[in-house]
């Protein structure tokens, strides 16, 4: 999808800036659902995928409560924003700087999402922006009624250690998988050397999951 970037959100005065791309993603999903009959789509069996920021957006959609407005005069806005599944690559699973620092000490990503700049300023601002973190961090939104997700990373985890690429470390995946397990949500985690790998990549997962018999709807 084509969505607004953080710089566009800042220029438009959207607060926090991350709201713009995430709500654009939700609107795109609603638009696709509104065209389900015309485009011969199953409105229930819709998954999301993406890499890095697109992965974070996909997980946000997977875990966020439905943003549909059934009373809206806009027929697109009445459509559900819930997913059947999500399969993502290199996802940032949290936007909480404290969690990032604990999982990967040399973390440096995320402050721009809330308009607070560099990572030290992000940490300092955490308490002030905590309501935003609770609304926009995928980890914070996980609940038992959420759809299954699949996470792929290019390197194995090293929790508590500095990483070469802390923005795309599989440490994010390990901690989300633990959290999902505690909530009763299926979360497949794949990285080099990962155990019990059923699907080698996100595409294989989506084909298998979206093609299976529907057990329960997520809309």
Regions found by a protein language model. Give the residues of each.
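Extracytoplasmic/secreted proteins, especially bacterial periplasmic and envelope-associated proteins
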Residues: 20, 24-27, 31, 56-60, ...
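Short, proline-enriched alpha-helix->beta-strand connector loops that line the catalytic pocket
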Residues: 79-84, 143-149, 183-186
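C-terminal catalytic histidine-bearing segment of alpha/beta-hydrolase fold enzymes
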Residues: 149-164, 170-216
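Primarily recognizes the serine-hydrolase "nucleophile elbow" in alpha/beta-hydrolase
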Residues: 27-103
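Solvent-exposed loop/turn segments at secondary-structure junctions
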Residues: 4-8, 52-56, 92-95, 156-158, ...
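Mobile cap/lid helix-loop segments that gate and shape the active-site cleft of serine hydrolases
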Residues: 62-72, 91, 97-141, 147, ...
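Catalytic nucleophile-loop/oxyanion-hole region of alpha/beta-hydrolase
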Residues: 2-43, 196-197
């Amino acid at each position: 999808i084509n969505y607004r970037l953080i710089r566009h959100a800042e220029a438009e005065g959207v607060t926090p800036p991350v709201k713009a791309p995430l709500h654009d993603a939700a609107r795109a999903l609603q638009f696709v659902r509104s065209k389900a009959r015309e485009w011969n789509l199953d409105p229930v069996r819709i998954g999301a995928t993406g890499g890095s920021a697109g992965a974070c957006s996909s997980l946000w959609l997977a875990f966020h409560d439905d943003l549909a407005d059934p009373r809206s005069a806009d027929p697109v806005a009445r459509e559900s924003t819930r997913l059947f599944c999500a399969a993502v690559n290199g996802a940032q699973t949290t936007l909480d700087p404290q969690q990032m620092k604990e999982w990967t000490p040399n973390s440096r990503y995320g402050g721009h999402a809330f308009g607070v700049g560099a990572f030290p300023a992000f940490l300092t601002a955490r308490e002030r922006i905590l309501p935003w973190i609770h609304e926009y961090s995928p980890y914070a939104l996980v609940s038992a009624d959420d759809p299954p997700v699949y996470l792929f990373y290019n390197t194995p985890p090293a929790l508590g250690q500095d990483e070469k690429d802390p923005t795309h470390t599989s440490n994010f995946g390990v901690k989300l998988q633990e959290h999902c397990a505690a909530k009763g949500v299926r979360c497949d985690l794949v990285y080099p050397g990962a155990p019990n790998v059923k699907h080698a990549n996100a595409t294989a997962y989506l084909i298998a999951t979206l093609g299976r018999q529907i057990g329960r709807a997520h809309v």
